């Protein structure tokens, strides 16, 4: 049997045990994992350093190196995030609906684990811990398949998790890492219907599209983030500058950073140069339409490809529009249903924008950077879903559950 088949089988066996574990047992394991991450700080940093060296030698871009990198603060933040899960309510067993029939049947709809979650992701070591601990909290087993660029980091993190599980009441095989990062293992996961209950891709558009296109396992899609902000004619200049600069520059390599800026032409003529200067001073390369290049001569001419691109880097495409309707039309054509925002003092335009734009999160006068499990109060997230079935937006604990009907009777039969 292949590594994928063997580890999926172990995970499935563990999932059958996990469903019987109590909240206290799961929380104890999470506490052990958090403590283990802090104790093994030097080991984790040393293993991550190997990935960074290899990444630079292999020509990985700075934004990928940033996502790949762990430092003491990031590891402590990851450990803190695990402990936050302990404080969150365990959704397993929650009663969602009850029905009492005239014949005396009592029907209750409750939350149950999904079973075995497959996770395929790119150069983000934090996802290894996020996915593992979210799955453990919700009574699931998980099969992790990261990228070759993060293999040393992922193996180190999972070794810490294993040691914690050995000390806990949870089955050690509930977390599995596929160490073979070849394309063949990914393709095997795509068709492992008897081993996985769901497959979650987390990464760039190419990875997500590949999984959605080729997987026969049900996919919980986490979409790419070609996010926009539209500055309407009545937007306050200071607020617009603050929000746009934050949404683009705070962390350009994440999926809720903006990639395109749409500006009402009247606002652009009056305030556009100052905003574009601020962005340029913050290290952002501007690729704009004709009016943008006229207002800000150091900008590059934008192409159709720029409107379509999730840069994940300090690059921003900027387009001027006549009105909110044109802004919405542009987003409908190029957006990825992730996070979109309007900055305006016109409530009618805000309502129109938030109603017409089809996205998981639509903001009025706020940065798109808030689309995040922690910011929404869910704790850590397994990803941000841009699809409409099962879950949409930041996916916290409830997104990793399914439902079951529990029916109690006293001998009723159907006539």
From Swiss-Prot:
<dbReference type="InterPro" id="IPR012134">
    <property type="entry name" value="Glu-5-SA_DH"/>
</dbReference>
<comment type="pathway">
    <text>Amino-acid biosynthesis; L-proline biosynthesis; L-glutamate 5-semialdehyde from L-glutamate: step 2/2.</text>
</comment>
<dbReference type="GO" id="GO:0005737">
    <property type="term" value="C:cytoplasm"/>
</dbReference>
<keyword id="KW-0521">NADP</keyword>
<dbReference type="InterPro" id="IPR000965">
    <property type="entry name" value="GPR_dom"/>
</dbReference>
<dbReference type="InterPro" id="IPR015590">
    <property type="entry name" value="Aldehyde_DH_dom"/>
</dbReference>
<dbReference type="InterPro" id="IPR020593">
    <property type="entry name" value="G-glutamylP_reductase_CS"/>
</dbReference>
<dbReference type="Pfam" id="PF00171">
    <property type="entry name" value="Aldedh"/>
</dbReference>
<keyword id="KW-0028">Amino-acid biosynthesis</keyword>
<keyword id="KW-0963">Cytoplasm</keyword>
<dbReference type="GO" id="GO:0055129">
    <property type="term" value="P:L-proline biosynthetic process"/>
</dbReference>
<dbReference type="InterPro" id="IPR016163">
    <property type="entry name" value="Ald_DH_C"/>
</dbReference>
<keyword id="KW-0560">Oxidoreductase</keyword>
<keyword id="KW-0641">Proline biosynthesis</keyword>
<dbReference type="GO" id="GO:0004350">
    <property type="term" value="F:glutamate-5-semialdehyde dehydrogenase activity"/>
</dbReference>
<protein>
    <recommendedName>
        <fullName>Gamma-glutamyl phosphate reductase</fullName>
        <ecNumber>1.2.1.41</ecNumber>
    </recommendedName>
</protein>
<comment type="function">
    <text>Catalyzes the NADPH-dependent reduction of L-glutamate 5-phosphate into L-glutamate 5-semialdehyde and phosphate. The product spontaneously undergoes cyclization to form 1-pyrroline-5-carboxylate.</text>
</comment>
<dbReference type="InterPro" id="IPR016161">
    <property type="entry name" value="Ald_DH/histidinol_DH"/>
</dbReference>
<comment type="similarity">
    <text>Belongs to the gamma-glutamyl phosphate reductase family.</text>
</comment>
<dbReference type="GO" id="GO:0050661">
    <property type="term" value="F:NADP binding"/>
</dbReference>
<dbReference type="InterPro" id="IPR016162">
    <property type="entry name" value="Ald_DH_N"/>
</dbReference>
């Amino acid at each position: 049997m292949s590594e994928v088949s063997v580890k999926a089988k172990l995970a499935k066996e563990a999932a059958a045990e996990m469903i019987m574990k109590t909240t206290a047992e799961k929380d104890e394991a999470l506490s052990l994992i958090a403590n283990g991450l802090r104790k093994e700080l030097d080991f984790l940093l040393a293993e991550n350093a190997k990935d960074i060296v290899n990444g630079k030698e292999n020509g990985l871009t700075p934004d990928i190196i940033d996502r790949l990198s762990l430092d003491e603060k990031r590891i402590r933040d990851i450990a803190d995030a695990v402990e936050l899960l302990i404080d969150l309510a365990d959704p397993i067993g929650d009663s969602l609906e009850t029905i009492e029939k005239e014949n005396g049947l009592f029907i209750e709809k409750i939350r149950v684990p999904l079973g075995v979650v497959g996770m395929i992701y790119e150069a983000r070591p934090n996802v290894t811990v996020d996915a593992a601990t979210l799955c453990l909290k919700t009574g699931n087993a998980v099969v992790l398949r990261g990228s070759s660029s993060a293999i040393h980091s992922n193996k180190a993190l999972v070794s810490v998790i294993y040691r914690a599980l050995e000390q806990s009441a949870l089955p050690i095989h509930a977390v599995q890492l596929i160490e073979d990062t070849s394309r063949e293992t990914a393709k095997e996961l795509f068709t492992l219907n008897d081993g996985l209950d769901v497959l979650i891709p987390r990464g760039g558009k190419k990875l997500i599209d590949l999984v959605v296109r080729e997987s026969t396992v049900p996919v919980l899609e986490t979409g790419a983030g070609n996010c926009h902000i539209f500055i309407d004619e009545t937007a306050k200049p200071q607020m617009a500058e603050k929000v746009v600069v934050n949404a683009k520059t705070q962390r350009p390599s994440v999926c809720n950073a903006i990639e395109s800026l749409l500006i009402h032409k009247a606002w652009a003529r009056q305030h556009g140069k100052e905003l574009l200067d601020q962005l340029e001073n913050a290290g952002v390369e501007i690729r704009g339409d004709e009016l943008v290049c006229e207002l800000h001569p150091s900008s590059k001419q934008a192409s159709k490809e720029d409107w379509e691109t999730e840069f994940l880097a300090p690059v921003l495409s900027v387009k001027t529009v006549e009105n909110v309707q044109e802004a919405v039309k542009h987003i409908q054509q190029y957006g990825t249903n992730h996070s979109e925002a309007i900055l305006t003092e016109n409530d009618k335009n805000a309502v129109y924008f938030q109603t017409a734009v089809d996205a998981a999160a639509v903001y009025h006068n706020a940065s798109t950077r808030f689309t995040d499990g922690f910011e929404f109060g869910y704790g850590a997230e397994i990803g941000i879903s841009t699809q409409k079935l099962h879950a949409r937006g930041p996916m916290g604990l409830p997104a990793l559950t399914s439902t079951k009907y529990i029916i109690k009777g006293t001998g009723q039969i159907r006539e």
